[in-house]
Amino acid sequence: MPSNCRRFEGKVAIVTAATKGIGLAIAERLLDEGASVVIGSRNQKNVDEAIEYLKNKGLTKVAGIAGHIASTDDQKKLVDFTLQKFGKINILVNNHGINPAFGHILEVSDQVWDKLFEVNVKAGFQMTKLVHPHIAKEGGGAIIFNASYSAYKSPPGIAAYGVTKTTLVGLTRALAMGLAKDNIRVNGIAPGVIKTKMSQVLWDGGEDAEKELTDIQEIALGRLGVPDDCAGTVAYLASDDSSYITGEMIIIAGGVQARL
C-alpha cells in the first residue's frame, strides 16, 4: 500500500525472506518511504524477479542476494553485500521462517525440530549479532522479528512451529534489554492468518472457505489478513514514531484473542 510518509530517507534496511508475501510487502513499504533495501532469499531467480517487480514500481534503491539464512557464510555475505552496496545498516527485519511439520507435536522428529529452531530462531539471533556493530555505529536503529500469533495461541497441527515463535517473543525481549544501551530498539510482529503462499493450504477454497476459517479462528474483523497489514506495522516499528517502544510484540490478527 503506497505511503505518503518519507520516514526512511537516508536509511538502509535488510529484509530477509523478502521475495514474496509479507517480506516483499515490507521491502516495498520501506522503499516507498525512502529507504535503501537489500532483500535476501534462497533462490536467485526469486530475488531477481522481486527486484524487477519493485523497480517497475519506481522503487529503485533496492538490491538483493541469494543465500540460505541458516548458513553463517551466507549471513555474512548478506551483511557484507549490504555494506558494499549502501555503506551502512540502520534496520534489520528478520522475516524468515519455515514450517515443515504438520501434526501432533510429539510426532515431530528430532531432525525437523532442530531445523525449525535453526531457521526460525537461531538464524535471526545470528543475523542480529552480525548487524549489531554496524547499527550501533550509526547511533542506533531498529531490529524487527516476524513471529506469529501461534506464539500465543497454538493452532492445531503447528504446535512445534508455535514453540519457535514463542521463543522469538523471549528473544525479542532479551535483545531489547541487551541492545538498549546502543539505542537499538528490538520489537516484533505476530501475524495471524495472512494470505500468503505459506498459509495457502488454510484458506485456498474461495469465499466460503475464508469465511469458515475466520469463524474457526474467531477473527473479530471477519477477514483474513494481507501482507500490507504487516508491512505498515513493521514500518512503524522501524521508524522514529516508535522511538519509545522496545521489547514489544504487536499481534496482527484481526482481533484474535492471543496472549501469553
From Swiss-Prot:
- Enzyme Commission number(s): 1.1.1.184
**What are the binding positions for substrate in this chain?**
S148
Lyase recorded as keyword: no
For binding NADP(+), which residues are annotated in this chain's numbering?
Answer: 14-38, 165
The GO terms this record gives for MF are: carbonyl reductase (NADPH) activity; catalytic activity
Keyword Oxidoreductase assigned? yes
Gene3D superfamilies (alphabetical)? NAD(P)-binding Rossmann-like Domain
Kindly identify the residues recorded as the active site. Y161
Using the UniProt record, name the top-level EC class of this enzyme in a single word. Answer: oxidoreductase
Keywords annotated in UniProt: NADP, Oxidoreductase
Name the catalysed reactions. a secondary alcohol + NADP(+) = a ketone + NADPH + H(+)
Q: What does this protein do?
A: Catalyzes the reduction of isatin, 4-oxonon-2-enal, 9,10-phenanthrenequinone, menadione, 2,3-hexaenadione, 3,4-hexanedione and 2,3-heptanedione.
What family is this protein classified in? Belongs to the short-chain dehydrogenases/reductases (SDR) family.
NCBIfam families in UniProt: PRK07231.1
Recorded protein name is Dehydrogenase/reductase SDR family member 4
Give the originating organism: Caenorhabditis elegans
